[in-house]
């Protein structure tokens, strides 16, 4: 799965809206929207917060991390 699909799946497994997930990982709603739309890639701070969210909610973080490492926003380098 691609990073946008992985992050959306993690959010939906906890039955959260994009807004609620954004609050959990300490970013703006629009940021989560851009991640899921493939228009942005989380920075290291955001990835740390996503990892903490996954650990707290018993979600496999490794697939998200792998997808993040392989993901590049169109028009930008990895």
Where in the sequence are the language-model features?
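Residue-level recognition of specific faces of alpha-helices
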Residues: 6, 31-34, 46
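Short alpha-helical DNA-recognition segment
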Residues: 15-34
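DNA major-groove recognition helix of helix-turn-helix/homeodomain DNA-binding modules
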Residues: 45-63
């Amino acid at each position: 799965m691609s990073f946008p699909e992985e992050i959306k799946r993690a959010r939906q497994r906890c039955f959260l809206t994009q807004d609620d997930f954004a609050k959990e990982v300490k970013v703006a709603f629009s940021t989560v929207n851009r991640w899921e739309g493939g228009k942005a890639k989380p920075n290291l701070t955001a990835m740390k917060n996503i990892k903490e969210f996954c650990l707290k909610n018993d979600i496999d973080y490794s697939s998200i991390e792998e997808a993040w490492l392989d993901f590049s926003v169109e028009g930008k380098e990895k």
